[in-house]
């Protein structure tokens, strides 16, 4: 049986934890950077977006029990202090460990594979968008993989269809993006004036790494795409708008047919 651990139980980590438990996968250990076991339990049971998780919760010492399943917990900021003996797969959802130099510390503790919930711009790390390039994964080569980013997962299937069938000359990407923990609730002094504005009262233009992440999947598009994000005061929905100039003439009919065919074929269940 494969033993799984999660480091970081924020927005993404919480949802992954729920999926692992719901699908009866062997989650052995969870580390959260903040709080304690009781605040973690409360955060899992009561979610501001998805409501109450109808599961049985119990906390004993440093052990969390969900539907009777025992999960060892800790609350550390340092990878070296984590309890990773016998862990096969570590899912890093901290949002801060985004370099191979830092992530290698997991292997020193005995972890066999690391999956990161954020994109990493390093050639030795596979940025995987399921349905688009999962075939590049080589178990003997890739010890660290990422699931890219939410925006990259949104646009990569679209780009796959257009670029592989017609060819993209260049393009622009705009994402209307949920607010995140990297922002501030109230106005504060900040070296980036936009980042210092209240997340709950403003539409905040900022950067997005999605265009760069796409070039990791399609190297020939490097420098041909640009993008920006607008952070908006919502938590659970985003929208991405793409404008492309194609390499050859096309039509609405051709484009729609390509998307329909892909949605019923290789991208079924991914492309709506």
Located regions from the model:
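N-terminal Rossmann-like NAD(P) cofactor-binding subdomain of oxidoreductases
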Residues: 1-185, 189-196
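Short glycine-aromatic motifs
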Residues: 57, 270-271
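Active-site-lining helix/loop region of Rossmann-like oxidoreductase modules
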Residues: 3, 7, 11-18, 25-26, ...
